[in-house]
């Protein structure tokens, strides 16, 4: 009789435990969030002469690639629809280092910056693990010493930037306010600079971020 009573109590305790787990299993909440990211990126420079120089025997073709590290900040709002899906919209500010060779032969670290708007769809496989996919539309600005022939006088330029992004999310904490993400970005756009003589373009330079991968930490603020 005592054994049966013990089994009954065990079953009740198990049911209560499962109920508590279920109520908090998908506890990720909507709210404002801040994020910090760090990762590696690739950049490519492609220089080519135009038809005018090519036809006069002055053909120029040069391509260089570089890899380095950078950091990013994020601020936005996340809305959770149900236990498996959500959407977030945020502002991002990124700075990526590039090593350049100056005219005197010395190397220096310069950067290009990205300021924009990101939109991600969130899909949770379970309470602690999920995926995301989205797009980042932004403005990109390359340091003048990366592209300018007269960097002391040329003005800083901002151009369009669009990239697809995707990754994995680990969600943790009592109220699921913390997340660590492994992300990857695939840029679609490039920045083209044109160099002219007597009003005629003679050389063009393309600069492009080729990829960006890394880790993010995201903290969501309570809305209650």
Regions found by a protein language model. Name each.
Residues 1-29, 223-224:
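Cleavable N-terminal export/targeting peptides
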Residues 26-78, 212, 218-222:
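Short glycine/proline- and aromatic-enriched beta-strand/turn motifs that initiate or cap beta-hairpins
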Residues 28-34, 79, 83-87, 127-131, ...:
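Outer-envelope beta-barrel architecture signal
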Residues 30, 63-71, 107-115, 156-164, ...:
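Residues that define the transmembrane beta-barrel architecture of outer-membrane proteins
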Residues 34-38, 87-91, 117, 131-135, ...:
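Membrane-embedded beta-strand positions of outer-membrane beta-barrel proteins
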Residues 42, 65-146:
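Gram-negative (and chloroplast) outer-membrane scaffold detector with strong preference
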Residues 45-56, 99-108, 143-154, 192-201:
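Outer-membrane beta-barrel translocator domains and adjoining extracellular loop/strand segments
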Residues 47-49, 94, 98, 157-224:
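Predominantly the C-terminal beta-signal and adjacent terminal strand-loop region
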């Amino acid at each position: 009789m005592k054994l049966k009573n013990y089994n009954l109590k065990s079953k009740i305790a198990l049911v209560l435990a499962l109920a508590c787990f279920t109520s908090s299993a998908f506890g990720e909440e909507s709210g404002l969030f801040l994020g910090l990211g760090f990762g590696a990126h690739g950049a490519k420079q492609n220089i080519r002469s135009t038809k005018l120089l090519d036809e006069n025997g002055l053909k120029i073709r040069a391509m260089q690639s570089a890899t380095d590290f950078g950091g990013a900040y994020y601020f936005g709002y996340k809305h959770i629809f149900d236990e498996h899906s959500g959407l977030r919209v945020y502002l991002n500010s990124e700075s990526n280092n590039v090593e350049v060779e100056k005219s005197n032969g010395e190397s220096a670290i310069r950067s290009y910056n990205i300021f924009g708007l990101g939109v991600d769809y969130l899909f949770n496989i379970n309470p602690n693990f999920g995926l995301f996919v989205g797009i980042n539309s932004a403005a990109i600005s390359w340091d003048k010493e990366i592209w300018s022939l007269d960097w002391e006088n040329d003005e800083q330029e901002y151009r369009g930037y669009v990239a697809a992004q995707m990754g994995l999310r680990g969600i943790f904490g009592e109220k699921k306010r913390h997340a660590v993400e492994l992300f990857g970005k695939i840029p679609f756009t490039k920045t083209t600079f044109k160099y002219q003589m007597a009003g005629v373009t003679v050389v063009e330079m393309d600069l492009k971020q080729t990829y960006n991968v890394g880790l993010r930490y995201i903290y969501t603020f309570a809305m209650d």
